[in-house]
Design a protein with these regions (language model features):
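Membrane-interface extramembranous regions at the lipid-water interface
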Residues: 2-5, 66-82, 138-151
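A surface-exposed beta-alpha-beta supersecondary segment
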Residues: 24-83
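Signature of small four-pass
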Residues: 2-34, 78-136, 153-180
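Non-transmembrane, juxtamembrane loop and terminal tail segments
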Residues: 180-187
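Individual transmembrane alpha-helices with interfacial aromatic-anchor signatures
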Residues: 34-48, 145-161
Length: 187
């Protein structure tokens, strides 16, 4: 049983799309988490000073010291916009994953074209999500004071990169020399 170039590209594209989907879940979870456990594992920004750890997402921030934690809601002006972009990033990453999987099992040029469009929109929403956060003056001031980006932010940026790779693979699969055909069986 052999695979043609189009199927191999489709399988790799599916892998990157799956990773982008998982990372979009982590980014969204870190942004909307409202407890120290959720923010510790997927915060968008964290800081440590004098035995006190601080974790923040879009909607909540938590401080932890000596086994005690205190969380409060952020009054950040951009939290609704960032939450909307994060949710749309998640939805478009999911739609992209489904379209790539469908394309792999039922090759169709129209599905490939729609998949490229959905992937591009997912990239735009992901870029807007981490761009709004990184461009905020309060975040910049915190970073200057010693805070660092957390795993939620990193997941969002990496999701963008993986969607970009999946988009490039999707466009390559549309080229005439990469036409996907059925898997051929042995004689």
């Amino acid at each position: 049983m052999g695979l043609d170039k189009g199927k191999i590209i489709g399988i790799v594209q599916l892998g990157f799309s799956l990773l982008a989907f998982i990372l979009s879940i982590v980014a969204l979870a870190g942004g909307v988490a409202d407890n120290v456990g959720g923010l510790k594992s997927a915060s968008w920004m964290s800081t440590e000073s004098g035995g006190i750890n601080g974790y923040t997402g879009w909607s909540h921030a938590c401080l932890e010291a000596q086994g005690q934690s205190q969380c409060s809601e952020n009054d950040w002006d951009q939290k609704d916009a960032t939450t909307a972009m994060g949710a749309l990033s998640f939805l478009f990453a999911l739609a992209n994953l489904v379209l790539v999987a469908v394309k792999l099992f039922k090759p169709n040029k129209m599905i490939s074209i729609i998949g490229c469009g959905v992937c591009f929109l997912g990239m735009i929403f992901t870029l807007a999500c981490f761009g709004i956060f990184a461009g905020d003056e309060g975040v910049s001031n915190s970073l200057d004071a010693g805070a660092s980006y957390g795993p939620g932010f990193g997941s969002s940026v990496t999701c963008f990169v993986f969607l970009l790779i999946a988009l490039v693979l999707g466009v390559i699969s549309l080229l005439p020399g990469m036409a996907t055909t059925e898997v051929t069986g042995g004689q």
